[in-house]
Amino acid sequence: TGIENYTADCLELPEPENLHDLASARTLSIRQCIGQFFSAFPMEKIVEGLALVEIKAPLNLNAEARLLLVWIESALNDCSDRVECSELKTEFICEKIDQGAAPCISFTYDCESFVECSLDLQGGVAQISARIGGDTHSMTAAIRLLEPQEALAEALFFG
């Protein structure tokens, strides 16, 4: 879907669960970075009061951004399901930005908490800054989009 103007989920297939979009596989290091960051916090602190998750990315990364947002939504729903009396009432938005601009992800809460993640794919660095549970946190991690052959291997072996 990185080349086409439609999403893979609109295809009618006899076994749609066997379709793996390589645009999703390409985001492996970004997903690992986000997961590693959030793994340091109790699930309650991650989902309570989360109002909006927004990914901004240039058009050439639209497929990756859209599928990354789907992955984030799924992970947050899993967290919410494990937290007592917590129903996730979060809006998820994917917005296009100027070509050449660095993608970013924002987690906006209805309290003082926030998470901002800048994805410098040219420089290979993700920078996360956050306030969760009243404390300030930051993390820097190496990121990159997988090459086509790596994305194919990721999709085939780990789907």
Label every PLM stretch briefly.
Residues L59-G159:
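C-terminal, charge/polar-rich interaction regions
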Residues T1-P42, D120-A126, R131-G159:
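Extended, well-ordered protein cores
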Residues A23-C85:
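ATP/pyrophosphate-binding catalytic subdomain of soluble kinases
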